């Protein structure tokens, strides 16, 4: 007959353990099940204490996570977007063990920041990334998912070159095509060089002779003319 054994001396106890050799107390026994039973009792005691302190640890973790999310909320406020906040919520959520836990954490944190949109995207993205990647590449996974669904990314057509380009509202205050960006960078560099060259021409080195200064002036003026063409290029 299969009986159940349980030691009354263990405060936390352990789940009823079945033994096939008869009913007896585990204390003083040489049964092979004894070590397992004692281990179960110790783990039960530890687990009981852990359950009591878990809410405190969870609260501390959520406070820290809310701080991390809060920094992104400020960034999003200036850009008129929610991308950075949602990404942080998803990244934070994926540090949990499973997809369900990540989804729950993501939706909970998201609800506290953005009721509705935060709940939906925090939960879904947290669950997907948590289930697929765990917490190892959480940030990369969240970014890839958000980019894939083009969250807060608008496709515009450039008036200059006619090509489509993506406006990342969460990174830029105003979308700029790559062709315009190159011109802006060229103009900025050319302006700085022109200022340097103009200063050189107006203040030639006192130690240089007249012929050398004349050559430098001619050389600088030639470069200055080329840079002006770049500045006036449309």
From Swiss-Prot:
Residues 1-23 are annotated as: Disordered. This is Uncharacterized protein C06E1.11.
């Amino acid at each position: 007959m299969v009986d159940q054994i349980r030691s009354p001396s263990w405060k936390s106890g352990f789940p009823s353990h079945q033994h096939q050799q008869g009913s007896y107390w585990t204390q003083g026994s040489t049964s092979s099940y004894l070590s397992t039973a004692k281990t179960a009792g110790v783990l039960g005691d530890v687990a009981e204490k852990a359950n009591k302190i878990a809410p405190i640890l969870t609260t501390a973790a959520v406070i820290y996570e809310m701080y991390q999310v809060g920094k992104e909320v400020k960034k999003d406020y200036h850009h008129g977007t929610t991308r950075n906040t949602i990404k942080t919520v998803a990244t934070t959520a994926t540090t949990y063990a499973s997809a369900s836990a990540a989804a729950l954490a993501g939706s909970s944190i998201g609800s506290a920041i953005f009721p509705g949109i935060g709940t939906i995207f925090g939960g879904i993205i947290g669950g997907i990334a948590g289930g697929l990647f765990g917490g190892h590449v959480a940030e990369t996974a969240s970014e890839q998912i958000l980019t894939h669904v083009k969250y807060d990314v608008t496709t515009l057509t450039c008036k200059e070159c006619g090509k489509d380009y993506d406006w990342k509202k969460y990174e830029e205050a105003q979308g700029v095509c790559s062709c315009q960006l190159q011109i802006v960078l060229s103009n900025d560099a050319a302006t700085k060089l022109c200022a340097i060259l103009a200063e050189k021409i107006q203040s030639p080195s006192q130690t240089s002779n007249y012929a050398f200064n004349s050559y430098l002036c001619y050389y600088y003026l030639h470069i200055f003319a080329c840079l002006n063409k770049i500045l006036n290029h449309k």
